[in-house]
């Protein structure tokens, strides 16, 4: 009598780039032994558009509409990093009111990004209801953006020396009303999700990253803070006016997918706290500074050495980047978003290197999914929170 034996061959499966859980055009080549993942190889580059090379052929103002296509769910942060570099190179003083407006916009953008992380993350692991709920609050954030900037996404709002336009009449009251409402919405999400036994079964103890391991991999943002490291660039660098506001770094020590979920949920409430303080303490005065102080320049005898130069808000190449190099960074929703900028005394940057948080956070994925089940890939990838626009650039 012949006994049929089960085949033990390994199976190679392509996940993506057209998979609904890939959050864009990511492709994973998986080696499976039954349902166990033996190996995982991410294939990137499907959304590569040459963003760094484009920057070398544009003035800073001309380049602003391009940068909102990196992380297209948190566009205020890409705009902030794009103008922070030239501002620091040119020693441009940003008015206090403009700095407060920037903080408000950045934190609203962080909330919108975390909301659109939460919905698909829950849908990936089988919970459909939160996916529809998050769009209520996200629409309110986009209504605020539309009232202030004219655009719901891709705002093109930040400018060298300030912002493009002041806040419209009644906007501050509208934003304060949103803050009060949003806190009740977050508590509703937590009742719905956080203690749900099926949700906990899917995320608890899945994709564990230790603190030292997170540092060695160069992780940042919620990925790092969920592993027990209290590191937030808003506290470390104190850029804009974050040092004047009272808020806390939210972190967890477990390092699993649940910890990353908890960090992002609590970050949304901290963002509301920051926005409320900024709205109540926003000073008067100008919302832009269009003068650049010219230090370290030889006096031009023909013009008697003007100490100031005018920054044009139009795309004309009037703002020259000094011959220096600089690394500047902000705390984006996904982690540390930075650019390395080299100027050469012209209107165009000589080098514009982007440090995208999603690209670096994604590197740890193959290690996290090994020896896990195939279904856990969705949980782990969702907890990393990637946007392929900034990964591929």
From Swiss-Prot:
Keywords: Chloroplast, Membrane, NAD, NADP, Plastid, Plastoquinone, Quinone, Thylakoid, Translocase, Transport. Its EC number is 7.1.1.-. It catalyses: a plastoquinone + NADH + (n+1) H(+)(in) = a plastoquinol + NAD(+) + n H(+)(out); a plastoquinone + NADPH + (n+1) H(+)(in) = a plastoquinol + NADP(+) + n H(+)(out). One of its GO terms (molecular function) is quinone binding. One of its GO terms (biological process) is photosynthesis, light reaction. Pfam families: Complex1_49kDa. Transmembrane segments: none annotated. Its main location: plastid. It is a peripheral membrane protein. It comes from the Eukaryota. InterPro entries: NADH_Q_OxRdtase_suD, NADH_UbQ_OxRdtase_49kDa_CS, NDH1_su_D/H, NiFe-Hase_large. SUPFAM superfamilies: HydB/Nqo4-like. The keyword NAD applies. It is found in: Plastid, Chloroplast thylakoid membrane. GO terms for cellular component: chloroplast thylakoid membrane. NDH shuttles electrons from NAD(P)H:plastoquinone, via FMN and iron-sulfur (Fe-S) centers, to quinones in the photosynthetic chain and possibly in a chloroplast respiratory chain. The immediate electron acceptor for the enzyme in this species is believed to be plastoquinone. Couples the redox reaction to proton translocation, and thus conserves the redox energy in a proton gradient. NDH is composed of at least 16 different subunits, 5 of which are encoded in the nucleus. Belongs to the complex I 49 kDa subunit family. This is NAD(P)H-quinone oxidoreductase subunit H, chloroplastic. It comes from Oenothera biennis (German evening primrose). The gene is ndhH.
